[in-house]
A protein has these predicted regions:
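Trp/Gly-enriched beta-strand/coil motifs that build multi-repeat beta-propeller-like domains
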Residues: 2-4, 8-586
Length: 586
């Protein structure tokens, strides 16, 4: 089955059905003339559904692997002699054949693997909660010397869990978990940084500080030593790729990219206290890619290579030359926008919402999922129950652990999250926004604005069942006619908020991760946005891990505004039309 199957989608659909029944049981009379929402042509602008994401496999064409050598760096200036070292072992060898494999999360939330002997197939991460969607998946390699590569999962709330390998089809049960990792916006597996033959971890904070976690060889008690700060200023990069051994010295290396597309090589030193040499520029123009990925050595020469993906889903392979630079790219496959997340990808992982809900004038709800290629899939009917016009709606970035948006519904002053009744008195608010985690605990939160313009933070409990007592975090927000957010626009990994003033000026409020003051001072990012009847935050539309925005004008034309990852947005691109049949977009 393709990465687009129905397990997670079925869960979402049942939530909508459940919440519909709940609201009905609360006394809501939804009987309406059938003509109130007569079937209308589906809004256009999206391609038909015969796509790689919904049936059939993405194509993959990687270099043919040669017999493994001691090193492929012979004859390259600055590279190691082939007789001096044995190349680093692959970190993502799922099936034990000595070669790195591909592990990724599909657009349905399921995990999939590709090995040398098997095309894309379901890969089961053994978890107590089958509906939990990890925020990131990391392959550090064989940490205990048993010949099998371990797999790490990182939850949105900051729990890093270690799974022993279960072969090409899945992992074993968790042997260790550690909390507090939500303080980092990127956790990477660069390979062996201290020369002991085991893979280590690199973690970056939103402010750009870098920490190294050295592996201990104990996969049950304490698999990593305490983190040690080894650098700062790494927030200049929007992609940090743990590349394993790029130059043939057996040590882990890093490939890092700036938002402008410049690529830098950090060679490992073998010294855990100072693990990298000074950076060397290795390329430019790489901003055409939305993800840089490492699958270890692709061609069998013992050197770590890079795979790059374009927004349309095309893959390109860059084979290492042994000195931190790469040979000319080679086409590597198509349709890989089907991967919402690659293990080994360089971007900050986006999690929580890649979708929209749209409400028709007759009160039906339609669901639009991000296609991960700058567009949406064709709409799907979420609820044909008429009468949703009597409910105040907002689609919040995930408030539980499944990674899907949660529908906030206020009816007669009572707030429901999906099928869960939260409480009464919510009629005092005229805007609810769920941009993600604003308090720094990794759990989705909600911002509520009252009729006086005061802004309140409701911290989520990570289950979507309860909020902490409200905290006032701002005032004067009645100057805005739209407040939206679904992830990070500024590149620091923290959830941000965008507000549109009544005169059409657009402002960005960067998230701080501090519950007491969750938003920084506003910055203007555009004008003229009052041309849009609807303005919404669907999350990441183009696969780069950064939150994007859309606007629908009075004619029903749909425009995407992709984030640059620097607190600005790109020029608009038209992606659809006919959306004037909707009176609400969330």
């Amino acid at each position: 089955m393709e990465p687009g199957s129905s397990v997670a989608r079925s869960k979402r659909a049942s939530r909508i059905a459940a919440c519909t029944a709940l609201v009905l049981s609360a006394g809501m009379l939804l009987a309406a003339p059938a003509s109130a929402d007569a079937p209308a042509p589906a809004p256009a602008g999206a391609a038909a559904q015969s796509t790689a994401e919904l049936g059939g496999q993405p194509t993959l064409s990687l270099p043919k692997r040669a017999a493994k050598k001691k090193s492929g760096a012979s004859g390259v200036a600055g590279a190691q002699s082939p007789s001096s070292v044995v190349p680093a072992e692959p970190r993502g060898d799922l099936d034990g054949d000595g070669a790195g494999d591909m592990l990724y999360r599909g657009l349905d939330g399921g995990t999939y693997a590709v090995t040398a002997t098997s095309d894309s197939h379901p890969y089961t991460i053994d978890s107590d909660d089958p509906y939990e969607t990890p925020k990131d998946i990391i392959t550090p390699g064989d940490l205990d010397g048993d010949g099998k590569a371990e797999v790490l999962t990182l939850s949105a709330s900051g729990t890093l869990s270690l799974h022993p390998s279960g072969g090409a089809d899945g992992t074993g049960r968790v042997t260790w978990s550690g909390n507090g990792w939500q303080k980092y916006n990127k956790v990477s597996a660069p390979g062996d940084l201290d020369g002991d033959g085991r893979g280590d971890l690199l973690a970056r904070t939103p402010s750009g500080d870098v920490y190294v976690y050295i592996s201990t060889g104990d996969v049950t008690g304490a698999p990593f030593e305490a983190g040690v700060k080894v650098g700062y200023g790494w927030n200049v990069y929007d992609q940090i790729v743990g590349a394993n051994d790029v130059n043939g010295d057996g040590l882990g290396d890093i490939i890092a990219r700036t938002p402008a597309g410049d690529v830098y090589f950090y060679a490992g030193t073998g010294d855990a206290a100072k693990p990298f040499k000074a950076r060397v520029k290795a390329g430019y123009g790489w901003d055409i890619y939305n993800q840089l990925i490492s699958f270890d050595d692709l061609d069998g020469d013992g050197l770590g290579d890079i795979v790059a993906r374009k927004p349309g889903g095309a893959l390109y392979t860059y084979l290492s030359k042994g000195d931190g630079t790469f040979a000319a790219r080679v086409e590597g496959g198509t349709g890989w926008n089907a991967a919402a997340l690659f293990a080994g990808a360089g971007g900050n992982p986006h999690w929580g919402k890649q979708e929209l809900e749209a409400r028709t004038e007759g009160g039906s709800l339609y669901w639009y999922q991000s296609r991960n290629n700058e567009n949406f899939f064709p709409r799907q009917l979420d609820s044909s129950d008429t009468g949703w016009n009597q409910v105040s709606l907002s689609l919040a970035s995930s408030l539980d652990n499944d990674g899907w948006g949660d529908l906030l519904q206020v009816y007669n002053g009572t707030l429901y999250v999906g099928a869960e009744e939260i409480g009464t008195g919510w009629q005092v608010y005229n805007s609810l926004t769920g941009p993600g985690d604003l308090s720094g605990d990794g759990k989705g939160d909600v911002l509520a604005r009252d009729t006086n313009g005061d802004l309140y933070l409701y911290q989520g409990n990570g289950l979507g069942t309860k909020f902490a007592a409200k905290v006032k975090v701002g005032y004067g927000y009645d100057t805005y006619n739209k407040i939206v957010g679904a992830g990070d626009l500024s590149g620091d990994g923290l959830a941000d908020v965008v507000a549109r003033a009544k005169d059409g000026t657009l402002y960005l409020y960067k998230g701080t991760g501090d519950a007491a003051k969750p938003l920084s001072a506003r910055t203007e990012i555009g004008t003229g946005y009052n041309i849009y009847t609807h303005f919404a935050a669907p999350g990441d539309l183009d696969g780069d891990g950064k939150a994007d925005l859309i606007g629908v004008d009075g004619a029903g034309d749909v425009y995407r505004y992709s984030s640059t990852g620097t607190g600005e947005i790109k020029k608009r691109a038209k992606i659809g039309y006919g959306w004037d049949i909707y009176n609400g977009l969330y």
